Amino acid sequence: MPKNSKVTQREHSNEHVTESVADLLALEEPVDYKQSVLNVAGETGGKQKVAEEELDAEDRPAWNSKLQYILAQIGFSVGLGNIWRFPYLCQKNGGGAYLVPYLVLLIIIGIPLFFLELAVGQRIRRGSIGVWHYVCPRLGGIGFSSCIVCLFVGLYYNVIIGWSVFYFFKSFQYPLPWSECPVIRNGTVAVVEPECEKSSATTYFWYREALDISNSISESGGLNWKMTVCLLVAWSIVGMAVVKGIQSSGKVMYFSSLFPYVVLACFLVRGLLLRGAVDGILHMFTPKLDKMLDPQVWREAATQVFFALGLGFGGVIAFSSYNKQDNNCHFDAALVSFINFFTSVLATLVVFAVLGFKANIMNEKCVVENAEKILGYLNSNVLSRDLIPPHVNFSHLTTKDYSEMYNVIMTVKEKQFSALGLDPCLLEDELDKSVQGTGLAFIAFTEAMTHFPASPFWSVMFFLMLINLGLGSMIGTMAGITTPIIDTFKVPKEMFTVGCCVFAFFVGLLFVQRSGNYFVTMFDDYSATLPLTVIVILENIAVAWIYGTKKFMQELTEMLGFRPYRFYFYMWKFVSPLCMAVLTTASIIQLGVSPPGYSAWIKEEAAERYLYFPNWAMALLITLIAVATLPIPVVFILRHFHLLSDGSNTLSVSYKKGRMMKDISNLEENDETRFILSKVPSEAPSPMPTHRSYLGPGSTSPLESSSHPNGRYGSGYLLASTPESEL
């Protein structure tokens, strides 16, 4: 050893030399005791190297304010599904009665599991990969599966933002380009586009002008250059929003999370002033109580709760990992969950106020068209004028008058009635036409807005709202990819984020072919549903059964400063896993009972037709599900047979102040200089409490001899235990 080394100098001095870890702990200042972390990575629960974790935790970015964090969680959880999925499910599954199973499942599944993800992210301060490796190394594949699902969802979700960008720029003109069918001129002859005439102006614009869609998924048709440019714009927006992490995305959230509520409020006020709005809202919330007994309603409600909160994606964990340790994540879970529910109900009011207005217009149009048919039959003596009630005035025909006339003709001309081709023109029939997803946003809603005064203004506002809703969700989705990868592999943040956006843009070209909409349907319906249910049920099992619900509750008590309700103990331990298992089983059965398919637009018929996926598409679909779930069994097998290190072969001690760490397994047996602390003995406080004392190889902790065999988050994180009697 060099003569001028500090060890040699101290050996020749009278200064006290620490010979062991026990002495080292005895010299720790009282203030260090509160902030120190003792990590013993033994064979039964090895964790990541703690010195690196301490450094990362101190250097980890943080939210500028609690408001910024809440807006980020709201922006991620409140997305396009709240606008076009929830209203459709509400209408389909019993109107107001659907809110009962939804609220019940939100309370017993949604909030507990959302709280769980917030808590583990905030406690461990890592992305999804680091969190689940830390809780249970053998289930570390959960984090990788979350990243893959986020990638799949981000690929097609940003395409929808691209569609909204296209409509947004097309809205800056009057009249709106989808308000009338195009006219084809051939010399002096002008005819309406046949495809548009058979369908409608908004439907034609969506399928032909925007998507230029092919007749099936097997017909690629090449790239749609307009949508390719819009996809590039969409990924550029997302890239700029997330390139600096929460420093950049947090500022974007102030606008992207709040602006949609301004637009929804404006649409609600405007919608309530429209003729027929009340009809739509009453139709929406009139409860059909018999639907509550249908298991399918509960399955769809559970699925919607599950996806509405963004469970399993990793975005919730990523956002909460930037919080302070003492943040009240229990309050955050309840607040964000109920804001999400409130947004869904608000969006439903807006949608059905507007659809009620549209239904009235379409109903009046139907009455006019059928009245013209009846006049034609009267003039050609096919029908007798005696069939027309005397008070009916064809120049001012009301829906009530038409309904009365229709019933008389149907009764008298019972045998010949079907040949007349008359429609009943019932308002209920128009309102019962279930529209969801892109059909609601890009067809039904756009058609309604063409009848608004100042329609371009409302169109600009609507599609700007969709862009912001999508952007908020994409920021969370990207965080679910970038945060765990950056935390785990220490790659440069900006370079990796930009690389992800570039990669996703080129892969996303699959969705901007002329057949791209069919691939969006495939990914939306099948790529994430089953994998996410598997991910969340394993997250629940990892915390509640492998780590231990009692220990987790105690950790929450130490972190929050109060004990969470015992309600969560039973939800995490029993109810939520059972519900998730039933949902997973139901999803698998649904895939088997209903062969996967999609709605194709047939140009020649100008109508949709349901087609089944061809064999190669089914193979792709199965591959997507397999790739998303494969990391879970792979990591489990590799770590079970010790083919992949889980960090359990090292025994390490780390200090926040001294930043001192040495791998004891690598120390020489007679090394007397292994731990030296530059403090004099007089500064040493009293010995550390038992639960903070050093555990040598083969020794037993008082905690390990109790009912907590693995310590907190495994044997590497030991804190004082709370008596079970308090649980």
From Swiss-Prot:
Origin species: Rattus norvegicus
Modified sites of kind Phosphotyrosine: 377
Residue numbers on the Extracellular membrane side: 90-96, 162-224, 270-304, 356-451, 514-528, 592-618
Any Pfam family hit: SNF
Membrane topology of the entry: Multi-pass membrane protein
Gene Ontology CC entries for this record: cell projection; GABA-ergic synapse; glutamatergic synapse; membrane; plasma membrane; postsynapse; synapse; synaptic vesicle
Phylogenetic classification of the source organism: Eukaryota, Metazoa, Chordata, Craniata, Vertebrata
Reported tissue expression: Found exclusively in the central nervous system and is more abundant in the cerebellum and the cerebral cortex. Expressed in PC-12 cell line.
Catalytic activity from the UniProt record: L-proline(in) + Na(+)(in) = L-proline(out) + Na(+)(out); L-leucine(in) + Na(+)(in) = L-leucine(out) + Na(+)(out); glycine(in) + Na(+)(in) = glycine(out) + Na(+)(out); L-alanine(in) + Na(+)(in) = L-alanine(out) + Na(+)(out)
pH dependence (UniProt free text): Optimum pH is 8.5.
Biased segments, Polar residues type: 698-709
Protein name (record): Sodium-dependent neutral amino acid transporter SLC6A17
Highest taxon above the source species: Eukaryota
Glycosylated residue positions: 186, 393
GO MF entries: symporter activity
Keywords: Amino-acid transport, Cell projection, Cytoplasmic vesicle, Glycoprotein, Ion transport, Membrane, Neurotransmitter transport, Phosphoprotein, Sodium, Sodium transport, Symport, Synapse, Transmembrane, Transmembrane helix, Transport
Residues passing through the membrane, by range: 69-89, 97-116, 141-161, 225-243, 252-269, 305-322, 334-355, 452-471, 495-513, 529-549, 570-591, 619-641
InterPro entries named among the record's database cross-references: Na/ntran_symport, Neutral_aa_SLC6, SNS_sf
Function: Synaptic vesicle transporter with apparent selectivity for neutral amino acids. The transport is sodium-coupled but chloride-independent, likely driven by the proton electrochemical gradient generated by vacuolar H(+)-ATPase in an overall electrogenic mechanism. May contribute to the synaptic uptake of neurotransmitter precursors in a process coupled in part to vesicle exocytosis.
Compartments, as annotated in UniProt: Cytoplasmic vesicle, Secretory vesicle, Synaptic vesicle membrane; Postsynapse; Presynapse
Positions carrying Phosphoserine: 13, 20, 665, 701
